[in-house]
C-alpha cells in the first residue's frame, strides 16, 4: 500500500513540473518559421467577407528537427465543430446555464509533412504551435515555450518503451447486442447500404469537477483542451470515412452531478442513466463521453459499451483524464469510440504498418491507423446493427460551399480530389490539380477499375433479394446507377409476402431475426392478444399510451413467434400460453418489447402481408392500393414491373411501359408542330399569290392587250370571222396548272403573254366538227 502511495505522489509531482511529459523521451528546442504559401488555393467563403478572421485557412511552417528540415502543411479543420455547438455550466446554486456559440473562427488545424508520404498532423495555433505530428512510424509532440508560433518550441519524441503512469488498460461492460432487424428507413437508405460512404458521429463531452478545477485558468484552457482532443479524434476517424463532430460540452462546475464510484463499471451505469434522463432532454447527440479526473479507477483508463452506438442508453463511455498530454487522452477517446462501433482489441496477427494501431490493448502512445481486423469489424457492425444516427450531417447547408483542391470532395471543375498531395493515395488522380492523370478515365466509383470505366453490363450492385434487381455499369460513368427494385406489392416467396422497398418481409423471417433461425411465426390465435392494449399487445403508441388493435388490424400489431432461444436483444421477452380449442392444445406466443431508434421492432414490420392484397402499414392492415402509389405498374408493364426509391414505375430491360400520359403529351406536341407548319406554309402561299396578282396588274398597265385573229373553225355558225382577245389553243401551260374547266371560266378580256404559249392550229380530236360540212 505504501509503495503505491509513494508512486502516485511522485507522478503528481512530475505532472506539476513544467514541460515534463510522461511517455516521451528527449526534447529538442526548435524555432518554427512561417512560410509563404507556394500557391494560393481557390477557397470559397462560408461567411461574410466583412468579418475579419484571426486565423488563416492554410499555413506552412518550417521546422528543423534532428538535422532535417520538415515543412508542416496545415489546413484549418472545417468539420470538427457542429453548427449547433453549445456549452453548459453550473452556478453555485446548481442552476444550468447554456450558451449556443456560432464558431466561425478557430485555431485548430490538420495536415501533413510536405514530401513525406506517410505523415499526419493535428495542431493548434492558438498560442504557439501545440499538438501532434507523425513522420512514418515516429510520433512527436510539440509545445510552445512562449506564446508565439515562431518563438521557442519544444519537440518531444514518443517512445512506446518508456513507462508512464500505468500501462493502459480499458474494459467493456459485459453485455451482448444482437443483430438489429432491417427497418425500412435504414434498409432503403443508400448511405446505409454503401459501407464506404461518409458517416457522422455527433459527439458530446462532459467534464467532471476535478477536470474543471485542474484546467480552469485561463478561462478558455479547458475548452481548447477538449477541442484539441476532438480535432485529434476527427483526424483518426477520417481514415474510416467517419466525421467526428463536437456538438457540445458540459462542465460540472462546483460539483459532480453523479456519484463517481470506485468501480468504473458502476460509474458508467450511473452516467448512462443520467445522460439519458437529463442530458438527452436538452441536447441531441450520438455519443457522450465523461472526462473524469478522479484517482479511483486503479489501472483502468476507460470503459464503454461494445457496439452501443445509436442506442440512447448505451452510446456512452468514460475516459480517465489525468495526463497533461491531450494526445494520449484523445487516443483513448478514439479507442473507446472504436469499442462502441463494434471493434475489439487488436491481437496478432492484427497489426498496422506503422507499428501501433488505435485498437491496441496497451494504448501507450498515440496511434492513427486501424488494422484490417478493426476495419472489418466496423463494417460488420454497420451491416448487423444499421446505426441510422450516423447518417445525419451536423453541418450547415452552406458547409460544402468551402471549395478547394485537396478537401477530398469533388467540387465544381474537378475531375477527382484525393486530398492534399501528401495524403493522396489514389494512383488515378493528380493531387496538385485535381484532374485525372493522362490516359485515365476515372478515379473512384463502383464502375471504376484500374483507373478505367468498366465496360457496360458489368454488375456493380448485385441483387440482395428476389425483390431486388442487380445494377450494371453503363460504360460511360464510374458511378453505379441508382438502386432499383421490383415494384412494391409484387408477390414474393411463393406468395407468402409482397415486395416492399426491395425486400420480401414475412413473419417467419422477422421471428428468426428477433430470436434465432429456429424461430417461426406462431398460431393465429396469438394475435388476439393485440387487443389488450399493453406493451406486449398493441398496434400504435401515442405519447407512451399503447392503443389496442382493431379486429381487422390484429395481425399488424405485435408479432408472436414460437421456437428458438430467448432473445439476447436489449429488450423484454414475454411468452403467453393460449389454449387452441380446435386442436385442444396449448400454443406458445412469444413476443418482445424493444425500442431501436424510437421504434418498437417487436411490431410486425411495415409491408408484411396481412391478407390477400393487404399489407401492414403503421399498425394497420390496409389495401395495397391505399398504401403504395405504384400499384398500377403491373398494368403498365407486361410483366416483371420494377420500382425505385422514389416509388416510380419502371420495366425490365426489353419492355416498354404503356405510358399513356406521356404518349398523349407526345401526340399533342406533334399536332401542334403540324399546325404551325401548315400556318407558315399558308402564309407563304398567300404572300406569293398577292405578289403574283400585283405582277399581273403591272404587266397589264405596261403592255396593251394583243388582238389576235380568230382561228377559222367551221364549227362556228356561218363563215363569220371573229376578233377575240382569248385565243383557242391546243396546248396551255399555266404555273398553277389550271384545269380545262377553269379555263372556260376565264373572262373574255384575259390576256397573259408570259404564261400562254401559242402554237399553230392543227386538226386534232379536240376540234368541233362543222355540222354543215357533215351534211354535205
Swiss-Prot record:
Species of the source: Macaca fascicularis
UniProt KW Signal keyword: yes
Per the record, membrane topology reads: Single-pass type I membrane protein
The entry describes its oligomerization and partners as: Interacts with ITM2B in sperm; the interaction increases following capacitation. Interacts with HSPA5 and CANX.
Q: Quote the CDD domains the UniProt record gives.
A: ZnMc_adamalysin_II_like
Q: Which Cys pairs are S-S linked? A: 310-389, 350-373, 352-357, 460-480
Q: Which residues lie on this side of the membrane: Cytoplasmic?
A: 691-776
Q: Which InterPro entries match?
A: ADAM_Cys-rich, Disintegrin_CS, Disintegrin_dom, Disintegrin_dom_sf, MetalloPept_cat_dom_sf, Peptidase_M12B, Peptidase_M12B_N, Reprolysin_adamalysin
Keyword field: Disulfide bond, Glycoprotein, Membrane, Signal, Transmembrane, Transmembrane helix
Where is the segment annotated Disordered? 757-776
The task this protein performs is described as: Required for normal male fertility via maintenance of epithelial cell morphology in the caput epididymis and subsequently correct epididymis lumen structure required for sperm development. Plays a role in sperm motility, flagella morphology and tyrosine phosphorylation during sperm capacitance. Plays a role in normal expression levels of HSPA5, ITM2B and ADAM2 in sperm both prior to and post-capacitation. This is a non catalytic metalloprotease-like protein.
- Any one GO molecular function term: metalloendopeptidase activity
One Gene Ontology BP term is: positive regulation of sperm capacitation
Q: What is this protein called?
A: Disintegrin and metalloproteinase domain-containing protein 7
Q: What gene makes this protein?
A: ADAM7
Claim: Acyltransferase is one of the keywords in the record? no
Residue ranges annotated for the Disintegrin domain, each copy included: 402-488
Amino acid at each position: 500500500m505504501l509503495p503505491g502511495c509513494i508512486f502516485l505522489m511522485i507522478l503528481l509531482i512530475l505532472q506539476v513540473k513544467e514541460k515534463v511529459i510522461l511517455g516521451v523521451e528527449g526534447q529538442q528546442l526548435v524555432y518554427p518559421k512561417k512560410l509563404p504559401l507556394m500557391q494560393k488555393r481557390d477557397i470559397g467563403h462560408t461567411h461574410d467577407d466583412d468579418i475579419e478572421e484571426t486565423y488563416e485557412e492554410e499555413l506552412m511552417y518550417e521546422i528543423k528537427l534532428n538535422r532535417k528540415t520538415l515543412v508542416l502543411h496545415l489546413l484549418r479543420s472545417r468539420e470538427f465543430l457542429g453548427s449547433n455547438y453549445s456549452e453548459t455550466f453550473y452556478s453555485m446554486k446548481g442552476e444550468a446555464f447554456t450558451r449556443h456559440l456560432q464558431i466561425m473562427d478557430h485555431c485548430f488545424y490538420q495536415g501533413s509533412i510536405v514530401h513525406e508520404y506517410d505523415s499526419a498532423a493535428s495542431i493548434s495555433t492558438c498560442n504557439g504551435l501545440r499538438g501532434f505530428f507523425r513522420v512514418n512510424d515516429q510520433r512527436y509532440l510539440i509545445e510552445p515555450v512562449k506564446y508565439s508560433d515562431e518563438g521557442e518550441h519544444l519537440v518531444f519524441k514518443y517512445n512506446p518503451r518508456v513507462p508512464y503512469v500505468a500501462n493502459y488498460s480499458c474494459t467493456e461492460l459485459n453485455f451482448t447486442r444482437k443483430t438489429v432487424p432491417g427497418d425500412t428507413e435504414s434498409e432503403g437508405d443508400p448511405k446505409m447500404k454503401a459501407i464506404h460512404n461518409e458517416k457522422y458521429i455527433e459527439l458530446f463531452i462532459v467534464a467532471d469537477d476535478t477536470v474543471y478545477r485542474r484546467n480552469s485558468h485561463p478561462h478558455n484552457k479547458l475548452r481548447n483542451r477538449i477541442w484539441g482532443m476532438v480535432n485529434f479524434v476527427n483526424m483518426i476517424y477520417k481514415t474510416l470515412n467517419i466525421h467526428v463532430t463536437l456538438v457540445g460540452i458540459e462542465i460540472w462546475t462546483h460539483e459532480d452531478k453523479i456519484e463517481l464510484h470506485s468501480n468504473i463499471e458502476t460509474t458508467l451505469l450511473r452516467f448512462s442513466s443520467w445522460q439519458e434522463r437529463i442530458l438527452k432532454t436538452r441536447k441531441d447527440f450520438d455519443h457522450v463521453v465523461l472526462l473524469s479526473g478522479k484517482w479511483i479507477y486503479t489501472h483502468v483508463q476507460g470503459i464503454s459499451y461494445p457496439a452501443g452506438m445509436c442506442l440512447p442508453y448505451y452510446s456512452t463511455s468514460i475516459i480517465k483524464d489525468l495526463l497533461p498530454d491531450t494526445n494520449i487522452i484523445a487516443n483513448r477517446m478514439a479507442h473507446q469510440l472504436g469499442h462502441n462501433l463494434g471493434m475489439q482489441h487488436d491481437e496478432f496477427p492484427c497489426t498496422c504498418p506503422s507499428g501501433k494501431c488505435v485498437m491496441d490493448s496497451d494504448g501507450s502512445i498515440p496511434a492513427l491507423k486501424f488494422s484490417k481486423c478493426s476495419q472489418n469489424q466496423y463494417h460488420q457492425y454497420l451491416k448487423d446493427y444499421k446505426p441510422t444516427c450516423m447518417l445525419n450531417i451536423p453541418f450547415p447547408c452552406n458547409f460544402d460551399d468551402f471549395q478547394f483542391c485537396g478537401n477530398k470532395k469533388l467540387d465544381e471543375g474537378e475531375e477527382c480530389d484525393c486530398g492534399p498531395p501528401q495524403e493522396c493515395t489514389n494512383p488515378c488522380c493528380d493531387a496538385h490539380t485535381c484532374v485525372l492523370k493522362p490516359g485515365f478515365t476515372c478515379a473512384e466509383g463502383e464502375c471504376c477499375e484500374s483507373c478505367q470505366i468498366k465496360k457496360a453490363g458489368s454488375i456493380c450492385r448485385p441483387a440482395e433479394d428476389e425483390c431486388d434487381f442487380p445494377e450494371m455499369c453503363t460504360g460511360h460513368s464510374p458511378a453505379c446507377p441508382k438502386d432499383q427494385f421490383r415494384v412494391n406489392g409484387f408477390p414474393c416467396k411463393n406468395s407468402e409476402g409482397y415486395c416492399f422497398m426491395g425486400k420480401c418481409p414475412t413473419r417467419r423471417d422477422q421471428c428468426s431475426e428477433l430470436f434465432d433461425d429456429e424461430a417461426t411465426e406462431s398460431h393465429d390465435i396469438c394475435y388476439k392478444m393485440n387487443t389488450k392494449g399493453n406493451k406486449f399487445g398493441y398496434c400504435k403508441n401515442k405519447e407512451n399510451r399503447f392503443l389496442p388493435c382493431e379486429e381487422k388490424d390484429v395481425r399488424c400489431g405485435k408479432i408472436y413467434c414460437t421456437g428458438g432461444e430467448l432473445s439476447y436483444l436489449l429488450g423484454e421477452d414475454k411468452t403467453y400460453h393460449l389454449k387452441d380449442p380446435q386442436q385442444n392444445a396449448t400454443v406458445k406466443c412469444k413476443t418482445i418489447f424493444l425500442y431501436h431508434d424510437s421504434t418498437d421492432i417487436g411490431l410486425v414490420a411495415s409491408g408484411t402481408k396481412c391478407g390477400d392484397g393487404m399489407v401492414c402499414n403503421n399498425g394497420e392492415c390496409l389495401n395495397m392500393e391505399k398504401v403504395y402509389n405504384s400499384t398500377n405498374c403491373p398494368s403498365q408493364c407486361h410483366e416483371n414491373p420494377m420500382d425505385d426509391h422514389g416509388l416510380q414505375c419502371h420495366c425490365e430491360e426489353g419492355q416498354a411501359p404503356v405510358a399513356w400520359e406521356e404518349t398523349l403529351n407526345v401526340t399533342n406536341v406533334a399536332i401542334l408542330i403540324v399546325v404551325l407548319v401548315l400556318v407558315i406554309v399558308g402564309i407563304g402561299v398567300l404572300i406569293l399569290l398577292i405578289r403574283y396578282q400585283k405582277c399581273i396588274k403591272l404587266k397589264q398597265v405596261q403592255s396593251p392587250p394583243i388582238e389576235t385573229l380568230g382561228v377559222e373553225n367551221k364549227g362556228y355558225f356561218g363563215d363569220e370571222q371573229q376578233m377575240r382577245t382569248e385565243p383557242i389553243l391546243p396546248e396551255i401551260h399555266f404555273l398553277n396548272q389550271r384545269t380545262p374547266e377553269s379555263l372556260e371560266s376565264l373572262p373574255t378580256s384575259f390576256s397573259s403573254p408570259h404564261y400562254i404559249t401559242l402554237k399553230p392550229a392543227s386538226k386534232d380530236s379536240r376540234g368541233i366538227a362543222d355540222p354543215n360540212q357533215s351534211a354535205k
